[in-house]
Amino acid sequence: MAQQQSLDVLVIGAGSGGYIASIRAGQLGLKVACVEANPYADPKGEPRPGGTCLNVGCIPSKALLSSSEEFEKIHKHALAHGIRVAGATMDVPAMIARKDAIVTKMAQGIEYLFRKNKVAYLKGQATILGRTDGGFRVAVTRSDSTQELTTRNLVIATGSLPRELPGIEVDNVDVCDNAGALDLRSVPRRMAIIGAGVIGLELGSVWRRLGAQVTVIEALPQLLPMCDADVAREVLKLLTAQGMDFRFGARVTGLERASDGSLGLAYVDAKGTADSLVCDKLVVAVGRVPTTSGLGLETLGVKTTQRGFVDVDAQCRTSVEGVYAIGDVVRGPMLAHKAEDEGVMVMECIAGQAGHVNYDAIPSIIYTSPEVAWVGRTEQELKDAGTAYRTGKFPFTANGRALGNGDTSGFVKVLADQKTDAVLGVHIISTYASEMIGEATMAIEFKASAEDIGRISHAHPTLYEAIREASLAIGTGALNL
């Protein structure tokens, strides 16, 4: 075993939370190392930083969503703009190569940032060995060596893995999880997706745009229960109109492979009737589970929940002093930016500062077309809490920029406290909703009122004017409706 190194903080995991935490530690002058053992190998076969988000999640999915959207624009929308395109085809291997190049470039960028901020980047499997005077002992194992480290503080940032579905074995050839669905080399004629959550909808959107017949099987009786009900209904209407087939209240019972290579997916529908469908590719997108096993957390007595999450307080402290956990391994939404915020907070706390995350002001986004974005409370949550509120809505059919873009689908919905007018929630369905939700997030973070938003000058013509109009609708009334 190699000689010990002594650190101020060791971060286990170089995903969104872990690498940002490590960089912030370096900025604060802490002696920091970050360990990564993920299976997403770089061209040299070494573990690559970035975690799920960079390697098989946020970034590659957005690359494919962008490519597939460009393809659909050419085929379905170009003529409306006076553009005539004949015979356009999709080179799927070239599309995948573009995606891979983006991932590689960003992974190299993270390693550069580690060097810039004096973060020791260690590639190997971290195992917690136990306590030592004033800290903890951790072994980092590679195929040919083991290095022991001591550290005053420990940050668990090991992310999550796709949830397995009993009886459905993922091979990432015909039966895929998110990683496999982002790496197909041809467009399947028929694709079935188990799970109508964010991952299922985004992956389904990619391959539907390229020509696949997409059927989504969902055990719940409705789409996107975490969304505002108005938003969920509108999303279902729009995606159905685009050609996605949804089957709700369906429970998968088995999978069979036919001699022609097709897959037969058996399920029981909402009425309890046995049914089945045939597909060429199956995507399993039934959620994710925290990655906490094999780390040695039990060696220190770190408490976990019944669902396997590390139990933490508001500042991501675990039950063991000096041990923190962030990102997908702790409570809350599995979002890259939430993990990043927690990483910054934890390092500032370790450095003696007042790190903080406002969990009421973390935006969520679904990158379908149109996009869906929200921050703050839904109308259902306000009703359940007994909070008196007012609602303002504004449709993009009355927005000049949306008309010019050729896509007027969706709306903005603003929820404000009935007494104080404080903005409690903002929900958007629109092209570029992901770029508009920032204003709403800032409004909630700084406790702005709907009137505040309504009195701020918004550039014209823009899509985000609709946020102002929806805010005005709560009070004196929208100006353009």
Task: Report each predicted region and the residues it spans.
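Flexible, glycine-rich terminal cap/loop adjacent to redox cofactors
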Residues: 12-49, 54, 59, 63-70, ...
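FAD-site-proximal beta/loop scaffold in flavoenzymes
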Residues: 171-188, 276-349, 435, 454
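Short loop/turn motifs at secondary-structure junctions and domain boundaries
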Residues: 259, 294, 301-303, 404-410
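Short hydrophobic core segments
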Residues: 10-12, 126, 148-159, 193-194, ...
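Gly/Ala-rich phosphate-binding loop of Rossmann-like dinucleotide-binding domains
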Residues: 22, 26, 204, 208-209
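Glycine-rich flavin
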Residues: 2-7, 23-187, 215, 220-224, ...
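Beta1/beta-strand and adjacent pyrophosphate-binding region of the FAD-binding site
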Residues: 3-17, 187-197
